[in-house]
Amino acid sequence: MIHQPPAGARDLLPLEVVQKAWINDRLQQVFGGWGYQRIVTSTIEWLETLMAGGAIQHSTVIQLQDNSAGQLGLRPELTASIARAAVTRMADTTYPQRLCYRANVFRNPPSGHHGKQLEFYQAGVELLFAGGILADAEILLLVADCLEQLGIPQWQLLIGEAGVTRSLLSPFPDPLKSQVCHCLAQLDYVTLENLDYPSSHLKERAQLLFDLRGNATEVLEKVAKLELDKAGEESINNLKSLMRLINDSRSKPLPLTLDLSVIQTFDYYTGIVFKAVGKTDNQLHILGQGGRYDQLLGVYHPKGQSAPGIGFSFNVEDLYACLLNTSILPQLAPSIDWLIIPQTDEARSTAFQYAQNLRDSGKNLRVAIDLGGRSEAEIREYVQQNRVQQLAWIPEKGEPIIEVIFS
Protein backbone atom coordinates (compact mmCIF):
# COMPACT_ATOMS: atom_id res chain seq x y z
CA MET A 1 0.00 0.00 0.00
CA ILE A 2 1.27 3.47 -0.91
CA HIS A 3 0.30 5.85 1.88
CA GLN A 4 -1.05 9.20 0.67
CA PRO A 5 -2.81 12.10 2.41
CA PRO A 6 -6.60 11.72 2.59
CA ALA A 7 -8.72 13.14 -0.22
CA GLY A 8 -8.82 16.92 0.10
CA ALA A 9 -5.51 17.18 1.99
CA ARG A 10 -1.97 17.76 0.75
CA ASP A 11 1.62 18.09 1.94
CA LEU A 12 3.80 21.18 1.48
CA LEU A 13 7.44 20.41 0.66
CA PRO A 14 10.35 22.67 1.75
CA LEU A 15 10.51 24.99 -1.28
CA GLU A 16 6.74 25.57 -1.29
CA VAL A 17 6.88 26.22 2.47
CA VAL A 18 9.61 28.83 1.93
CA GLN A 19 7.68 30.51 -0.88
CA LYS A 20 4.41 30.67 1.05
CA ALA A 21 6.25 31.87 4.16
CA TRP A 22 7.62 34.70 1.99
CA ILE A 23 4.06 35.66 1.02
CA ASN A 24 2.88 35.52 4.63
CA ASP A 25 5.85 37.52 5.90
CA ARG A 26 5.26 40.29 3.33
CA LEU A 27 1.58 40.45 4.25
CA GLN A 28 2.36 40.64 7.97
CA GLN A 29 4.79 43.50 7.30
CA VAL A 30 2.10 45.45 5.47
CA PHE A 31 -0.51 44.68 8.14
CA GLY A 32 1.91 45.90 10.82
CA GLY A 33 2.61 49.06 8.85
CA TRP A 34 -1.09 49.90 9.07
CA GLY A 35 -1.15 49.33 12.84
CA TYR A 36 -2.56 45.78 12.97
CA GLN A 37 -1.54 43.31 15.69
CA ARG A 38 -1.49 39.56 15.22
CA ILE A 39 -4.02 37.39 17.05
CA VAL A 40 -4.08 33.58 17.23
CA THR A 41 -7.36 31.80 17.93
CA SER A 42 -8.09 28.12 18.45
CA THR A 43 -8.37 25.81 15.45
CA ILE A 44 -11.16 24.00 17.31
CA GLU A 45 -14.30 25.91 18.33
CA TRP A 46 -17.78 25.15 19.55
CA LEU A 47 -19.98 24.49 16.56
CA GLU A 48 -22.35 27.21 17.73
CA THR A 49 -19.50 29.75 17.63
CA LEU A 50 -18.45 28.72 14.13
CA MET A 51 -21.96 29.05 12.72
CA ALA A 52 -21.99 32.79 13.58
CA GLY A 53 -25.64 32.95 14.54
CA GLY A 54 -26.72 30.94 11.50
CA ALA A 55 -24.74 32.99 8.94
CA ILE A 56 -22.47 30.00 8.22
CA GLN A 57 -24.11 26.79 7.06
CA HIS A 58 -23.88 23.76 9.33
CA SER A 59 -22.75 21.62 6.38
CA THR A 60 -19.71 23.84 5.76
CA VAL A 61 -18.09 22.95 9.09
CA ILE A 62 -15.96 19.82 9.48
CA GLN A 63 -17.28 18.49 12.77
CA LEU A 64 -15.42 16.48 15.38
CA GLN A 65 -16.76 13.70 17.54
CA ASP A 66 -19.30 14.70 20.17
CA ASN A 67 -17.83 16.26 23.27
CA SER A 68 -19.64 15.88 26.59
CA ALA A 69 -20.08 19.66 26.76
CA GLY A 70 -21.25 20.15 23.17
CA GLN A 71 -20.43 19.73 19.49
CA LEU A 72 -17.00 20.85 18.24
CA GLY A 73 -15.77 21.78 14.77
CA LEU A 74 -12.75 23.01 12.80
CA ARG A 75 -12.95 26.69 11.86
CA PRO A 76 -14.10 27.29 8.25
CA GLU A 77 -12.93 30.93 8.49
CA LEU A 78 -11.38 33.26 11.09
CA THR A 79 -13.80 36.17 11.41
CA ALA A 80 -16.25 34.42 13.74
CA SER A 81 -13.48 33.22 16.07
CA ILE A 82 -11.83 36.65 16.20
CA ALA A 83 -15.19 38.34 16.82
CA ARG A 84 -15.80 35.91 19.69
CA ALA A 85 -12.34 36.59 21.16
CA ALA A 86 -12.69 40.37 20.83
CA VAL A 87 -16.06 40.48 22.58
CA THR A 88 -15.28 37.99 25.35
CA ARG A 89 -11.55 38.49 25.96
CA MET A 90 -10.77 42.07 24.90
CA ALA A 91 -13.76 43.98 26.26
CA ASP A 92 -11.57 46.34 28.32
CA THR A 93 -9.23 47.37 25.49
CA THR A 94 -9.41 50.63 23.59
CA TYR A 95 -11.23 50.88 20.29
CA PRO A 96 -11.03 50.47 17.38
CA GLN A 97 -9.27 47.10 17.44
CA ARG A 98 -6.95 46.34 14.52
CA LEU A 99 -6.21 42.61 14.45
CA CYS A 100 -4.47 40.45 11.84
CA TYR A 101 -3.87 36.73 11.41
CA ARG A 102 -2.42 33.96 9.32
CA ALA A 103 -3.83 30.49 9.82
CA ASN A 104 -5.30 27.40 8.22
CA VAL A 105 -9.05 26.91 7.84
CA PHE A 106 -11.08 23.79 7.03
CA ARG A 107 -14.26 23.44 4.97
CA ASN A 108 -16.46 20.61 3.85
CA PRO A 109 -16.76 20.67 0.05
CA PRO A 110 -20.23 21.01 -1.48
CA SER A 111 -22.18 17.80 -2.00
CA GLY A 112 -20.88 15.81 -4.96
CA HIS A 113 -17.38 17.33 -4.82
CA HIS A 114 -15.50 14.46 -3.16
CA GLY A 115 -11.75 14.99 -3.21
CA LYS A 116 -11.94 18.78 -3.31
CA GLN A 117 -9.54 20.64 -1.05
CA LEU A 118 -10.51 20.64 2.64
CA GLU A 119 -7.69 22.67 4.17
CA PHE A 120 -6.83 26.23 3.13
CA TYR A 121 -4.32 28.85 4.26
CA GLN A 122 -5.43 32.42 4.84
CA ALA A 123 -4.00 35.73 6.01
CA GLY A 124 -6.17 38.72 6.78
CA VAL A 125 -7.30 41.50 9.10
CA GLU A 126 -10.33 42.49 11.15
CA LEU A 127 -11.03 46.15 11.98
CA LEU A 128 -13.43 45.91 14.92
CA PHE A 129 -15.63 48.51 16.63
CA ALA A 130 -15.19 50.89 13.70
CA GLY A 131 -17.98 51.89 11.34
CA GLY A 132 -18.36 54.41 8.55
CA ILE A 133 -16.72 55.28 5.28
CA LEU A 134 -13.24 55.91 6.73
CA ALA A 135 -13.01 52.34 8.04
CA ASP A 136 -14.31 50.95 4.73
CA ALA A 137 -11.72 52.99 2.83
CA GLU A 138 -8.90 51.86 5.14
CA ILE A 139 -9.66 48.21 4.47
CA LEU A 140 -9.92 48.60 0.69
CA LEU A 141 -6.72 50.66 0.53
CA LEU A 142 -4.97 48.08 2.73
CA VAL A 143 -6.00 45.30 0.32
CA ALA A 144 -4.52 47.32 -2.56
CA ASP A 145 -1.31 48.01 -0.63
CA CYS A 146 -0.86 44.29 0.12
CA LEU A 147 -1.32 43.24 -3.50
CA GLU A 148 1.06 45.94 -4.71
CA GLN A 149 3.72 45.06 -2.11
CA LEU A 150 3.51 41.39 -3.11
CA GLY A 151 3.92 42.32 -6.77
CA ILE A 152 0.81 40.51 -8.00
CA PRO A 153 1.00 41.14 -11.77
CA GLN A 154 -2.69 41.47 -12.69
CA TRP A 155 -5.43 42.06 -10.16
CA GLN A 156 -8.72 43.84 -9.79
CA LEU A 157 -11.03 44.71 -6.92
CA LEU A 158 -14.73 43.87 -7.27
CA ILE A 159 -16.84 45.90 -4.84
CA GLY A 160 -20.49 45.35 -4.00
CA GLU A 161 -22.91 46.38 -1.28
CA ALA A 162 -24.80 43.72 0.66
CA GLY A 163 -27.57 46.13 1.69
CA VAL A 164 -28.19 47.24 -1.89
CA THR A 165 -28.14 43.65 -3.17
CA ARG A 166 -30.63 42.56 -0.50
CA SER A 167 -32.88 45.49 -1.44
CA LEU A 168 -32.71 44.50 -5.11
CA LEU A 169 -33.52 40.88 -4.21
CA SER A 170 -36.44 41.75 -1.93
CA PRO A 171 -39.19 41.29 -4.63
CA PHE A 172 -38.21 37.61 -5.12
CA PRO A 173 -40.11 34.99 -3.07
CA ASP A 174 -37.88 33.11 -0.60
CA PRO A 175 -37.22 29.81 -2.43
CA LEU A 176 -36.45 31.64 -5.66
CA LYS A 177 -34.38 34.28 -3.87
CA SER A 178 -31.96 31.60 -2.61
CA GLN A 179 -31.61 30.17 -6.11
CA VAL A 180 -30.93 33.60 -7.62
CA CYS A 181 -28.35 34.31 -4.89
CA HIS A 182 -26.58 31.04 -5.65
CA CYS A 183 -26.44 31.82 -9.38
CA LEU A 184 -25.06 35.31 -8.69
CA ALA A 185 -22.41 33.97 -6.31
CA GLN A 186 -21.33 31.29 -8.83
CA LEU A 187 -21.63 33.61 -11.87
CA ASP A 188 -23.93 30.98 -13.39
CA TYR A 189 -25.96 32.92 -15.97
CA VAL A 190 -27.29 29.82 -17.74
CA THR A 191 -28.98 28.47 -14.61
CA LEU A 192 -30.16 31.96 -13.65
CA GLU A 193 -31.89 32.36 -16.99
CA ASN A 194 -33.68 29.01 -16.69
CA LEU A 195 -35.07 29.33 -13.17
CA ASP A 196 -38.82 29.08 -12.69
CA TYR A 197 -39.87 32.74 -12.41
CA PRO A 198 -43.49 33.59 -11.52
CA SER A 199 -43.35 36.62 -13.85
CA SER A 200 -41.28 38.01 -16.71
CA HIS A 201 -40.68 41.11 -14.58
CA LEU A 202 -38.76 39.07 -11.98
CA LYS A 203 -36.75 37.28 -14.66
CA GLU A 204 -35.73 40.63 -16.17
CA ARG A 205 -34.79 41.88 -12.69
CA ALA A 206 -32.60 38.81 -12.09
CA GLN A 207 -30.87 39.30 -15.45
CA LEU A 208 -30.32 42.97 -14.64
CA LEU A 209 -28.83 42.04 -11.26
CA PHE A 210 -26.37 39.75 -13.01
CA ASP A 211 -25.27 42.64 -15.23
CA LEU A 212 -24.80 45.22 -12.47
CA ARG A 213 -21.02 45.22 -12.77
CA GLY A 214 -18.54 47.48 -14.50
CA ASN A 215 -17.52 51.13 -14.30
CA ALA A 216 -18.73 52.56 -10.98
CA THR A 217 -20.44 55.59 -12.52
CA GLU A 218 -22.29 53.53 -15.13
CA VAL A 219 -23.45 50.90 -12.61
CA LEU A 220 -24.72 53.55 -10.21
CA GLU A 221 -26.69 55.15 -13.07
CA LYS A 222 -28.39 51.78 -13.76
CA VAL A 223 -29.24 51.33 -10.08
CA ALA A 224 -30.74 54.81 -9.91
CA LYS A 225 -33.46 53.63 -12.33
CA LEU A 226 -34.51 50.79 -10.02
CA GLU A 227 -36.81 50.97 -7.05
CA LEU A 228 -34.89 50.72 -3.78
CA ASP A 229 -36.08 50.97 -0.22
CA LYS A 230 -34.81 53.76 2.03
CA ALA A 231 -31.95 51.65 3.39
CA GLY A 232 -30.90 50.74 -0.15
CA GLU A 233 -30.84 54.39 -1.23
CA GLU A 234 -28.73 55.30 1.81
CA SER A 235 -26.31 52.48 1.00
CA ILE A 236 -25.94 53.76 -2.57
CA ASN A 237 -25.14 57.27 -1.31
CA ASN A 238 -22.51 55.84 1.05
CA LEU A 239 -21.06 53.82 -1.81
CA LYS A 240 -20.72 56.95 -3.95
CA SER A 241 -18.91 58.74 -1.11
CA LEU A 242 -16.61 55.75 -0.61
CA MET A 243 -15.67 55.65 -4.30
CA ARG A 244 -14.75 59.35 -4.22
CA LEU A 245 -12.68 58.95 -1.05
CA ILE A 246 -10.73 55.98 -2.42
CA ASN A 247 -9.96 57.69 -5.71
CA ASP A 248 -8.87 60.89 -3.95
CA SER A 249 -6.60 58.95 -1.56
CA ARG A 250 -4.34 57.36 -4.18
CA SER A 251 -1.81 58.75 -6.61
CA LYS A 252 -3.07 56.33 -9.27
CA PRO A 253 -6.59 54.93 -9.78
CA LEU A 254 -7.50 51.68 -8.08
CA PRO A 255 -8.23 48.83 -10.56
CA LEU A 256 -11.82 48.68 -9.39
CA THR A 257 -15.08 47.28 -10.71
CA LEU A 258 -18.38 48.01 -9.02
CA ASP A 259 -20.27 44.71 -8.92
CA LEU A 260 -23.61 44.73 -7.12
CA SER A 261 -24.05 41.03 -7.87
CA VAL A 262 -21.15 40.17 -5.52
CA ILE A 263 -22.45 37.81 -2.85
CA GLN A 264 -20.14 36.21 -0.30
CA THR A 265 -20.29 32.60 0.83
CA PHE A 266 -20.90 33.55 4.46
CA ASP A 267 -24.09 35.49 5.14
CA TYR A 268 -23.06 37.87 7.94
CA TYR A 269 -22.21 40.85 5.72
CA THR A 270 -24.26 44.03 6.10
CA GLY A 271 -22.43 46.68 4.07
CA ILE A 272 -19.73 46.73 1.43
CA VAL A 273 -18.50 43.35 0.20
CA PHE A 274 -15.56 42.81 -2.10
CA LYS A 275 -13.33 40.31 -3.84
CA ALA A 276 -9.78 40.71 -5.12
CA VAL A 277 -9.36 38.80 -8.37
CA GLY A 278 -6.14 37.84 -10.18
CA LYS A 279 -5.46 36.21 -13.53
CA THR A 280 -2.89 33.67 -14.75
CA ASP A 281 -2.96 32.01 -18.17
CA ASN A 282 -6.62 32.92 -18.69
CA GLN A 283 -7.55 31.42 -15.30
CA LEU A 284 -9.18 33.62 -12.66
CA HIS A 285 -8.14 33.37 -9.01
CA ILE A 286 -10.04 34.74 -6.03
CA LEU A 287 -7.09 36.30 -4.21
CA GLY A 288 -9.14 37.50 -1.27
CA GLN A 289 -12.57 38.53 -0.06
CA GLY A 290 -14.19 40.47 2.74
CA GLY A 291 -16.75 43.01 3.79
CA ARG A 292 -18.58 44.80 6.57
CA TYR A 293 -20.41 42.86 9.29
CA ASP A 294 -22.15 45.19 11.75
CA GLN A 295 -24.29 42.52 13.45
CA LEU A 296 -21.78 39.70 13.95
CA LEU A 297 -20.14 40.95 17.17
CA GLY A 298 -23.57 41.07 18.82
CA VAL A 299 -23.88 37.29 18.35
CA TYR A 300 -21.11 36.78 20.91
CA HIS A 301 -21.87 39.67 23.29
CA PRO A 302 -23.43 38.53 26.61
CA LYS A 303 -26.18 41.14 26.20
CA GLY A 304 -26.43 40.90 22.42
CA GLN A 305 -25.00 44.39 21.88
CA SER A 306 -24.00 44.89 18.25
CA ALA A 307 -20.87 46.72 17.17
CA PRO A 308 -19.46 47.49 13.72
CA GLY A 309 -16.69 45.51 12.09
CA ILE A 310 -15.05 45.02 8.70
CA GLY A 311 -12.29 42.74 7.47
CA PHE A 312 -10.89 40.56 4.72
CA SER A 313 -8.90 37.39 4.16
CA PHE A 314 -6.36 36.57 1.47
CA ASN A 315 -6.27 33.07 -0.01
CA VAL A 316 -2.57 32.22 0.18
CA GLU A 317 -2.85 29.40 -2.38
CA ASP A 318 -4.25 31.79 -5.00
CA LEU A 319 -1.67 34.48 -4.26
CA TYR A 320 0.96 31.77 -4.67
CA ALA A 321 -0.51 30.68 -8.02
CA CYS A 322 -0.32 34.24 -9.35
CA LEU A 323 3.32 34.65 -8.24
CA LEU A 324 4.59 31.18 -9.14
CA ASN A 325 5.65 32.02 -12.71
CA THR A 326 7.30 35.30 -11.73
CA SER A 327 10.82 35.80 -10.38
CA ILE A 328 9.44 37.38 -7.19
CA LEU A 329 9.21 34.26 -5.02
CA PRO A 330 12.34 32.56 -3.65
CA GLN A 331 13.45 30.03 -6.23
CA LEU A 332 15.39 27.72 -3.90
CA ALA A 333 14.97 26.39 -0.39
CA PRO A 334 17.64 27.67 2.05
CA SER A 335 20.99 25.95 1.61
CA ILE A 336 23.29 24.62 4.34
CA ASP A 337 26.08 27.08 5.17
CA TRP A 338 28.42 24.54 6.77
CA LEU A 339 28.69 20.75 6.80
CA ILE A 340 30.90 19.52 9.65
CA ILE A 341 32.49 16.11 9.00
CA PRO A 342 34.21 14.19 11.82
CA GLN A 343 36.98 12.11 10.24
CA THR A 344 37.21 9.59 13.09
CA ASP A 345 35.00 8.38 15.91
CA GLU A 346 37.22 10.25 18.36
CA ALA A 347 36.57 13.52 16.47
CA ARG A 348 32.77 13.38 16.83
CA SER A 349 32.54 15.41 20.05
CA THR A 350 34.97 17.99 18.63
CA ALA A 351 32.76 18.23 15.52
CA PHE A 352 29.66 18.95 17.61
CA GLN A 353 31.59 21.64 19.54
CA TYR A 354 32.89 23.21 16.32
CA ALA A 355 29.36 23.27 14.84
CA GLN A 356 27.92 24.91 17.95
CA ASN A 357 30.63 27.57 17.95
CA LEU A 358 29.62 28.46 14.39
CA ARG A 359 25.93 28.67 15.37
CA ASP A 360 26.82 30.86 18.37
CA SER A 361 28.82 33.27 16.21
CA GLY A 362 25.73 35.46 15.72
CA LYS A 363 25.78 35.14 11.94
CA ASN A 364 22.54 33.11 11.75
CA LEU A 365 24.32 30.21 10.08
CA ARG A 366 22.76 26.89 9.07
CA VAL A 367 25.20 24.23 10.28
CA ALA A 368 24.74 20.46 9.86
CA ILE A 369 26.77 17.49 11.08
CA ASP A 370 27.63 14.60 8.80
CA LEU A 371 26.27 11.55 10.61
CA GLY A 372 28.72 9.05 9.19
CA GLY A 373 28.36 5.91 7.14
CA ARG A 374 29.15 7.61 3.81
CA SER A 375 32.19 7.64 1.59
CA GLU A 376 33.87 10.91 0.64
CA ALA A 377 32.32 10.62 -2.84
CA GLU A 378 28.85 10.25 -1.34
CA ILE A 379 29.45 13.24 0.94
CA ARG A 380 30.50 15.38 -2.02
CA GLU A 381 27.42 14.30 -3.99
CA TYR A 382 25.24 15.35 -1.03
CA VAL A 383 27.10 18.69 -0.88
CA GLN A 384 26.38 19.41 -4.54
CA GLN A 385 22.71 18.43 -4.35
CA ASN A 386 22.09 20.52 -1.23
CA ARG A 387 24.24 23.52 -2.20
CA VAL A 388 26.40 23.27 0.94
CA GLN A 389 28.61 26.35 0.96
CA GLN A 390 31.53 25.25 3.16
CA LEU A 391 32.93 22.01 4.58
CA ALA A 392 34.91 21.53 7.77
CA TRP A 393 36.76 18.22 8.03
CA ILE A 394 37.43 17.62 11.74
CA PRO A 395 40.47 15.43 12.51
CA GLU A 396 41.10 13.68 15.81
CA LYS A 397 43.92 16.15 16.48
CA GLY A 398 44.95 19.40 14.87
CA GLU A 399 43.10 22.12 13.01
CA PRO A 400 39.97 21.58 10.87
CA ILE A 401 40.42 21.45 7.11
CA ILE A 402 38.10 24.05 5.53
CA GLU A 403 36.76 23.83 1.97
CA VAL A 404 34.73 26.56 0.30
CA ILE A 405 32.32 24.92 -2.17
CA PHE A 406 29.86 27.72 -3.04
CA SER A 407 30.45 31.35 -2.17
From Swiss-Prot:
GO cellular component: cytoplasm
One Pfam entry name: tRNA-synt_His
Pathway: Amino-acid biosynthesis; L-histidine biosynthesis; L-histidine from 5-phospho-alpha-D-ribose 1-diphosphate: step 1/9
Cell compartments where the protein resides: Cytoplasm
UniProtKB keywords: Amino-acid biosynthesis, Cytoplasm, Histidine biosynthesis
GO biological process, one term: L-histidine biosynthetic process
GO molecular function: histidine-tRNA ligase activity
Coiled coil (residue ranges): none
Main localization of the protein described in the UniProt heading: cytoplasm
Family: Belongs to the class-II aminoacyl-tRNA synthetase family. HisZ subfamily.
Misc remark: This function is generally fulfilled by the C-terminal part of HisG, which is missing in some bacteria such as this one.
NCBIfam families assigned: hisZ_biosyn_reg, PRK12292.2-3
Quaternary structure and interacting proteins, as annotated: Heteromultimer composed of HisG and HisZ subunits.
Protein task: Required for the first step of histidine biosynthesis. May allow the feedback regulation of ATP phosphoribosyltransferase activity by histidine.
Protein name: ATP phosphoribosyltransferase regulatory subunit
Protein source organism: Rippkaea orientalis (strain PCC 8801 / RF-1) (Cyanothece sp. (strain PCC 8801))
Organism taxonomic ancestry: Bacteria, Bacillati, Cyanobacteriota, Cyanophyceae, Oscillatoriophycideae
Primary gene name: hisZ
